[in-house]
A protein has these predicted regions:
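A short, Lys/Arg-enriched amphipathic alpha-helix followed by its capping loop at the start of a domain
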Residues: 2-11, 30-43, 240-243
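Asp-based phosphoryl-transfer active-site loop
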Residues: 3-24, 47-48, 207, 237
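Short loop/turn segments at strand-loop or loop-helix junctions that form parts
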Residues: 10-16, 79-82, 88-90, 128-131, ...
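Active-site phosphate-binding/coordination module
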Residues: 29-130
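Conserved acidic, metal-coordinating active-site core of Asp-based
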Residues: 123-225, 232, 238
Length: 306
């Protein structure tokens, strides 16, 4: 095990920057090419996602493994916003580990599953692959407008089940404490799903898990790049910045609003989602091969506030 830290570490959201939001797979071949090239060059890769471990193993990792991951590659997958994790090497994937303290109580999870399957089967499907969270995802043949119109009602029904079970819940910024005044869970809607989860989960917890896991396999990079498509993804860079790492964040969907942060924010001109992800991965591959390669330029820009 070398004692020299790698020159760079990558902490990557999956949906948007890596997996196409349309196909929900790696649709751009160069993304898989560059991820493998970076990993085989000794750059630690972390996939930090709200998705399940099964989603990564079945939809995202196969093209990487097909291209050949070396024995020196360090790839960590943190799933369900920090509740589940596993590693990847040339032999394949390890068994997932679950932090059971972050799971929705079993009886409540069953009631939520029953509601999803019986009352909302024309709106969402129950994600059977989640181990700690309860997730209901929009049916692929349903329009976004129709889904979002009914999502509010779905979320309200989920809230009723949870509060009736004595759980303290946060939903859309409003807190509903339990009898002791505690709020330990949240209902977290996205544009294609609702996640029902412990409020300890988040992309910042995923970043913490990633650094801990990488520390067990070798030196930790001081310089990091995080990539995401939503405001919640900035929590990855927030955590790294707060812990004195040199970090910049790439926002692949900046039109939704770029917050003020104490670290640099990069954007890709004229590209969003996985097209933007492909552009920055290609630039980092070139940079690792030749350290004189500028990170900014050629369509990659430093975001300027205002």
């Amino acid at each position: 095990m070398t004692s020299t830290p790698p020159p760079l570490g990558l902490l990557l959201d999956v949906d948007g920057p890596i997996a196409s939001p349309i196909s929900r797979t790696i649709a751009i071949d160069s993304i898989a090419d560059d991820l493998v090239a970076l990993a085989n060059a000794g750059i630690p890769l972390v996939f930090n996602t709200g998705r399940s471990d099964a989603f990564l193993r079945e939809r995202v990792l196969p093209p990487l493994l097909e291209r050949g991951v070396s024995a020196d590659a360090r790839i960590v997958c943190v799933c369900e916003k920090g509740a589940v994790w596993f590693t990847v090497d040339y032999r394949g994937t390890s068994e997932p580990i679950v932090d059971e303290s972050l799971a929705i109580p079993e009886a409540v999870a069953r009631d939520l599953e029953r509601m999803i399957r019986e009352d909302y089967d024309d709106l969402v499907f129950f994600d059977e692959t989640k181990r700690a969270m309860v997730s209901a995802e929009q049916l692929v043949d349903l329009s976004s407008e129709d889904y979002l119109e009914r999502q509010l009602v779905f979320d309200a029904d989920a809230l009723q089940i949870m509060t009736a079970a004595g759980l303290g819940v946060e939903r859309r910024g409003i807190r509903y404490p339990n009898d002791t005044g505690a709020v330990e869970y949240r209902i977290d809607p996205t544009v294609i799903s609702t996640d029902i989860e412990s409020n300890r989960l988040g992309k910042d917890l995923g970043a913490q898990r990633a650094v801990e896991l990488l520390g067990a396999t070798g030196p930790i990079p001081q310089r990091w790049r995080t990539v995401g498509d939503s405001r919640s993804d900035y929590a990855m860079a927030d955590w790294l910045s707060e812990h004195a790492y040199d970090v910049a964040h790439v926002d692949v969907r900046p039109a939704e609003g770029v917050p003020d942060k104490p670290y640099p924010i990069l954007v890709v001109d004229g590209a969003i989602n996985d097209e933007a992800g492909a552009a920055v991965l290609r630039r980092w591959t070139e940079l690792v091969a030749d350290e004189t390669t500028p990170e900014v330029g050629g369509g990659i820009s430093l975001h300027v506030a205002g």
